[in-house]
Every structure is written in structure tokens, then in C-alpha cells.
């Protein structure tokens, strides 16, 4: 196990983090390049996405918190300042979905998923450094989501809105998704950053939001017959429940456990542990004899998407 730990640390530092520092840093326009293709070619004119930049912010902040290397602090600060200066909507709140290579707003919609990742990144930077500005930004984004994207009538979080927080026709995260106003994926990546923010900002209002999100997972998103998590819903939480996503199942089983641990409530932890064991067992249905995990099961027609996508593995 110790050898595995050292091997993984070596891959993290010398193959992953080092690559992003030396290959993807945009020295001309700031931040990081928006695209490197499959042939390892940088595309300097590519747009820059909020999710990618927020994930960079989280990754280098977490790396610095654990490993304390100054180059990770520099990369984290670079990402923090770029997201702050170019993605934050200083007029309406929230963050833009994308900017052009120069840092000008491109797609200004408010995708709740992306705002969640920004909270994740800024809260991790605050956790790693004690930086008050990063914490203040994370708190402000939390309030933006709660004010504009939380549906108090039906419960849950709206998938996307316009820049001014008005209804938007196309709420999809990507072209392959159903156009539902509620998705499991977005709720997963709201409970994740809320949990991280709670580590550095323990307030009753945030705790209430997190507990409600746990209830949404157990009462709305969890299929009590299969113990898979269903993916797409409308405002009234009606959905087809026709897709089983093994990667999301195993991801959720870990993240929900992490949330329960951070809350520190033994009763909640006991309840969550019983459920996530069943979710993890359901995810095992996607495993194949070579140890890989296929992507999805479409219950309509009983077909499998046999792709082995990296994040699922």
C-alpha cells in the first residue's frame, strides 16, 4: 500500500500537476489555455470555461494544502485571480459559463453546476491559505445560488438561468443531456462545494442547506427499487428514470459519505452509510471482468454504453 501511495504521488506531481504548470499556463493572456487537443497541441485562441478554471483552482489549492510546494501556491493564486477577475459577474452575481481567450465574457448564462465548482475552488483556496478574499467570494456565490437557483416551492436547485437570473430555454450542461430543470449531477456538485465551504465557514444557514441536499438525494434522486441515482427531472421531480450511470453512482457514494462526516452528526452518518453501501453495490453492476467500469445502462431496450470514460474509472 505504501508503494501504491508513492506511485500515485509521483504520477500526481510529475505527470499531472507539472504538465499543467508548464504546458497549459497562458503567459500572454493570463490564467490557463482553454484547450489542448489529443495531439498535445495548445490552442491559444480557444475559449476558457468556468468549470475547467475552477477545477484548476481547486486542484492546485488542494495540492498546496497537502504538499506545501510554492509552485502549487503560485498556480493556485494564478487561477484564483483569473477566475476572480474574468469569470465573476460583478453586476449580477454568479459566474459566466465561458470567456474568450482574452478573458472577455462569452457565454454569460448562469449554470448552477459551474457556480458550484467556483465555490469548491475558492473555498479550497481559503482552506489552504486562510485567504479572506477567497472565502468571501465563495460565501457570496453560495448566497447567489440560494437566492436565485434554489426553488423553495418544489425544493431543489434549478439547472441554469440567464445572466440576469431569469428562466432560460436550454438548461442542459452538454448536448448529450436531457433538458431537465433538475439533475442529479448538478445536485451532486452543489453538495460537494457546500461541504467544502462548511469546513471553513460553519454557519447554521449552510448546515441547513447541506442537510436539505442530503434529503434530496435520499428522497428524490435515489431510486428505491434499484439503488441507482436517477439523472433528469422536471420542476415537480418527475423523470423518466431510464438511465443508470455507474460513474455517478460510485462518485455519489463517496461524496455523500464525505458530507456526512463533515457534518459530524452520528445519526446522519449512520443513515447515509446504510444508503451509500447500497448505491456502491448498484454501481458494481457496471464492472467488467477486466476491472473496468462501463459508462451507462439504458433501461429502454436494455442497452449498455460500453465506453470506458476516464472519470468513471
List each language-model region with its residue ranges.
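Glycan-recognition and catalytic cores of secretory/periplasmic carbohydrate-active enzymes
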Residues: 1-313
Amino acid at each position: 500500500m505504501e508503494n501504491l501511495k508513492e506511485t500515485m504521488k509521483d504520477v500526481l506531481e510529475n505527470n499531472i500537476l507539472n504538465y499543467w504548470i508548464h504546458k497549459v499556463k497562458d503567459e500572454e493572456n493570463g490564467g490557463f489555455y482553454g484547450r489542448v487537443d489529443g495531439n498535445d497541441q495548445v490552442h491559444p485562441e480557444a475559449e476558457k470555461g468556468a468549470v475547467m478554471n475552477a477545477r484548476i483552482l481547486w486542484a492546485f489549492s488542494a495540492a498546496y494544502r497537502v504538499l506545501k510546494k510554492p509552485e502549487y501556491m503560485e498556480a493556485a493564486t494564478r487561477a484564483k485571480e483569473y477566475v476572480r477577475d474574468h469569470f465573476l459577474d460583478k453586476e449580477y452575481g454568479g459566474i459566466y459559463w465561458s470567456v474568450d481567450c482574452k478573458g472577455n465574457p462569452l457565454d454569460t448564462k448562469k449554470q448552477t453546476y459551474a457556480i458550484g465548482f467556483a465555490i469548491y475552488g475558492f473555498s479550497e483556496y481559503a482552506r489552504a491559505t486562510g485567504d479572506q478574499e477567497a472565502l468571501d467570494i465563495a460565501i457570496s456565490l453560495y448566497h447567489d445560488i440560494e437566492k436565485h437557483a434554489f426553488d423553495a416551492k418544489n425544493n431543489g436547485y434549478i439547472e441554469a438561468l440567464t445572466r440576469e437570473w431569469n428562466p432560460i430555454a436550454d438548461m442542459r450542461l452538454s448536448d448529450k443531456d436531457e433538458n431537465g430543470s433538475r439533475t442529479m449531477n448538478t445536485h451532486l456538485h452543489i453538495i460537494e462545494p457546500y461541504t467544502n465551504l462548511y469546513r471553513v465557514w460553519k454557519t447554521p444557514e449552510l448546515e441547513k442547506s447541506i442537510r436539505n441536499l442530503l434529503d434530496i438525494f435520499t428522497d428524490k434522486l435515489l431510486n428505491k427499487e434499484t439503488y441507482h441515482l436517477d439523472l433528469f427531472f422536471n420542476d415537480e421531480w418527475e423523470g423518466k428514470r431510464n438511465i443508470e450511470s455507474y460513474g455517478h453512482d460510485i462518485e455519489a457514494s463517496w461524496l455523500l459519505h464525505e458530507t456526512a462526516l463533515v457534518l459530524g452528526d452520528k445519526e446522519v452518518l449512520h443513515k447515509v452509510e446504510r444508503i451509500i453501501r447500497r448505491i456502491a453495490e448498484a454501481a458494481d453492476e457496471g464492472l467488467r471482468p477486466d476491472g473496468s467500469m462501463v459508462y451507462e445502462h439504458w433501461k429502454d431496450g436494455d442497452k449498455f454504453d460500453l465506453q470506458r470514460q476516464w472519470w468513471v474509472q
